[in-house]
């Protein structure tokens, strides 16, 4: 076997392989003999068909079959011999396939990029320094009360924060428009869930009132025939309800799994959860800054086959997030909506893998178990979760990858200029959310 390799780009190789004619012809002859023993032809007893007849009748079909197998076998031998690291499947085409001649085929494939990591030593990374105060706990408890509030009818004018029960019908000029009517609709004023200007005109209304509300649909409204149109809604108010917050008592705190210790135990539990959330937010913010710096310092080429694989994974995730069901055909989602994000994720993954390799990082069984135990604390039956993860090789490998990723990020932070920045609990969470939002916005812009 003769092999030559041509680099057509940083990550593409064109491999030409020649297989001696004698080897091919011998393999074809052997397969024809096997065929002669097993095939049935009218006028011949099984196993007694002359080889010349078998060759005439099945020769091309057998040769195609043998050549296909030999190309697959010799492709594997060739990339092993040339120490190539393929990313995805190759495109293989025979260029010479004739009896008595050496078989020649060309395999075009993408390979993983080879590169040396550039340092991020000049990058400044902000690390939020925050703590959960008593005031933060008070605010969180108020938020929990609001989330568990009940609506109670009130005999007064509606105010922001109240809920009104209404019938409405929308008109363009004198004609009602499709989808613009509802009965018994419950609307929280100030929620901004309706067209701009609609909710504001219901402030001050009482049960039994009938109003005409004039609004203008936004220019970017999802229903194109309504975008930018002026409309009038005829509205009847049936009920005004105020929000009644529950008292922080034993009944309330039991909703959150606190059976003993009263309000003090509840506050301690809330604070513990907030501290965990804060820790995760700080970790994620620092991590994302480090990964962004790593990618900017190392703009490596990415195999298209890996981008395509990641794109399909992102499409499946999107289908799950939007509740499209297991039977949904993700091919209906355009690849271009996910391609840029997929490329970034693959690029970061390759860079992190190189950080792990260069620094000879590994994750011990104890480290994997500790991470599983940490994750399991989020569930009601942690013991079952731990057992499931540790006995499932696929899940265990995912945890190992997570541990290695964190170790790689720690190595990056050793290079970078990490600056501690004092901020409040809310500011720390907002900083993390803003960074995530900026990344999502950038993805939307590049996909637009």
Curated annotation (Swiss-Prot):
Q: Where is the PPIase FKBP-type domain?
A: 161-246
Biological process terms in GO annotation: 'de novo' cotranslational protein folding; cell division; chaperone-mediated protein folding; protein transport; protein unfolding
Q: Which family does it belong to?
A: Belongs to the FKBP-type PPIase family. Tig subfamily.
Instruction: Report the locations given in the UniProt record.
Output: Cytoplasm
Please write the reaction equations for the catalytic activity of this protein.
[protein]-peptidylproline (omega=180) = [protein]-peptidylproline (omega=0)
Protein name (record): Trigger factor
Domain comment from the record reads as follows:
Consists of 3 domains; the N-terminus binds the ribosome, the middle domain has PPIase activity, while the C-terminus has intrinsic chaperone activity on its own.
């Amino acid at each position: 076997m003769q092999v030559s390799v041509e680099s057509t780009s940083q990550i593409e190789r064109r491999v030409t392989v020649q297989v001696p004619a004698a080897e091919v012809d011998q393999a074809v002859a052997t397969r024809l003999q096997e065929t002669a023993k097993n095939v049935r032809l009218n006028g011949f007893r099984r196993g007694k068909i002359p080889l010349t007849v078998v060759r005439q009748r099945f020769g091309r079909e057998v040769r195609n079959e043998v050549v296909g197998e030999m190309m697959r076998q010799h492709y594997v031998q060739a990339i092993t011999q040339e120490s190539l690291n393929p990313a995805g499947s190759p495109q293989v085409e025979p260029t010479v396939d004739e009896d008595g001649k050496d078989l020649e085929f060309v395999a075009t494939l993408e390979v993983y990029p080879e590169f040396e990591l550039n340092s991020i030593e000049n990058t400044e990374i902000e690390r939020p320094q925050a703590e959960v105060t008593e005031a933060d706990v008070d605010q969180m408890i108020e938020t929990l009360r609001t989330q568990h509030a009940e609506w109670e009818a009130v005999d007064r004018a509606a105010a922001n924060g109240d809920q009104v029960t209404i019938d409405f019908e929308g008109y363009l000029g004198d004609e009602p428009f499709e989808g613009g009517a509802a009965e018994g609709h419950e609307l929280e004023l100030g929620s901004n869930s309706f067209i701009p200007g609609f909710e504001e005109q219901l402030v001050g209304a009482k049960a039994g009132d009938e109003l005409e509300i004039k609004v203008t649909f936004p220019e970017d409204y999802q229903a194109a025939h309504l975008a930018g149109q002026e409309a009038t809604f005829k509205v009847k108010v049936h009920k005004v309800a105020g929000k009644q917050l529950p008292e922080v008592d034993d009944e309330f705190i039991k909703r959150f799994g606190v059976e003993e210790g009263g309000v003090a135990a509840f506050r301690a539990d809330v604070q513990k959860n907030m501290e965990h959330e804060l820790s995760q937010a700080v970790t994620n913010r620092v991590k994302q800054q480090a990964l962004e710096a790593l990618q900017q310092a190392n703009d490596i080429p990415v195999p298209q086959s890996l981008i395509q694989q990641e794109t399909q994974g992102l499409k499946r995730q999107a289908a799950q997030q939007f509740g499209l069901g297991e039977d949904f055909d993700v091919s209906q989602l355009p690849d271009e909506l996910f391609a840029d994000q997929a490329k970034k994720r693959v690029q970061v993954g390759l860079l992190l893998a190189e950080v792990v390799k260069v620094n000879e990082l590994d994750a011990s069984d104890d480290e994997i178990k500790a991470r599983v135990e940490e994750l399991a604390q989020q569930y009601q039956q942690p013991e079952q979760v731990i057992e499931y993860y540790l006995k499932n090789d696929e899940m265990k490998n995912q945890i190992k990858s997570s541990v290695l990723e964190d170790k790689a990020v720690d190595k990056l932070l050793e290079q970078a200029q990490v600056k501690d920045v004092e901020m409040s609990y809310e500011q720390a969470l907002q900083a993390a959310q803003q960074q995530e939002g900026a990344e999502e916005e950038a993805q939307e812009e590049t996909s637009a």
